[in-house]
């Protein structure tokens, strides 16, 4: 199991490399990381909360269309066969939703990386792939056949509320962890 000290050391090694954004994803796979996911994301979080580091944070990884430079890609291993509908409250996770421990670990990792790299935990610097896709025109309400909706909605482990905006959940938990 990867420790917080390992995450902090990883972030320390990435200082002064121009990293100023973090993008959060789901892999569209099972709860275990595979070789394709390892190639695309800096960090993967498996269904049981196991954290897998895939190189250095300064390594170039292709995770978010036109947003890979100066960015870290972190993915939750989940959402195998999942589908979303134009009514976003109608997500079919196909038995592989993000687990509460994955969401907690994601927020924890963001908290420590953002602190070390001095990345503000706000909607400009830490976002889900769904949020980036909406900005860039290939989100849920665009017409792109390669639409992305990664972590559009999440259950909030802090409040117990279901189907909350994913970016808000992640940032809120990360900020809470940063302040406590």
Question: Which role fits each region the language model picked out?
Answer:
Residues 1-68:
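N-terminal catalytic cores of peptidoglycan-degrading enzymes
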Residues 66-85:
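Short coil-to-beta-strand
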